[in-house]
Amino acid sequence: MSDKQERKVVIRFDHVTKEYKLYKNDKARFKAIFSKRVKYKLKRAVNDLSFEVRKGEGIALIGKNGAGKSTILKMITGVSYPTSGEIYVDGKISALLELSSGFDLESSGIENARFKCSLMGMTNEEIEEVLPDIIEFADLGEYLEQPLRAYSSGMKARLGFAISVNSKPDILIVDEALSVGDKEFRKKCVKKVREIMADKDVTLLFVTHALSTAKEFCQRGIVLEKGTKLYEGDIDDAIEFYDAM
């Protein structure tokens, strides 16, 4: 039995479809809460999608804007739910998506770090253990004691990245987050992801337009177009398929 076969499945999509109702305007959307007669159009963001990710794998979701990549990530993280089909996820997820979202602007950087770690299910003891790593990685100095309303958008993103990569995830989801901050900080981010992926028990789901980066971190790729899977296989073959589209 191969190593891949022995490792357990940590993410499974089983014939998953996701549709959104598009209304003419906000007024129509509000009326739809009280009446089923309001007209709308259905937009299918993900179409009958099936795939599995095993523990320790690195998988790249490849596709142009509108391919359904962000919708897939939202369903994995529980932000959104499928219209039909089943999704199975096993493990603590750290998602490098909207890095500066979910912060309390009136609380300090340190307070926000503790709060976001607690939302990830970490105990107080675990939080205090990783807090020095978050502080060192964010490299925000005295600003960590200041309320986030004093932060620039880049500083918030740095803090968000520092929290996510130091929270000891089972599953790491990266969506263009490696473009955070200046050149030196971006190099620091890439190095940190390399360190995380050196742990064969961490699973990576990677969404990027930088295919060379995907090639470095991932073994397999899934090519998507308008919510439909066109190809799944070895990362080199997936990139070649995408380039030929």
Where are the regions that the model predicts?
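Pre-NBD coupling/linker segments of ABC/ABC-like ATPases
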Residues: M1-A45, A238-A244
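Conserved ABC ATPase "signature" region
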Residues: K31-A32, R114, E126-Y143
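The feature captures the beta-strand-to-loop junction immediately N-terminal to the Walker
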Residues: I62-K64
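Helix-to-loop junction immediately C-terminal to a conserved catalytic motif
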Residues: T77
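H-loop/switch region of ABC-family ATPase nucleotide-binding domains
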Residues: T208-H209
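H-loop (His-switch) and adjacent beta-strand-loop-beta switch element
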Residues: F217-D234, Y242
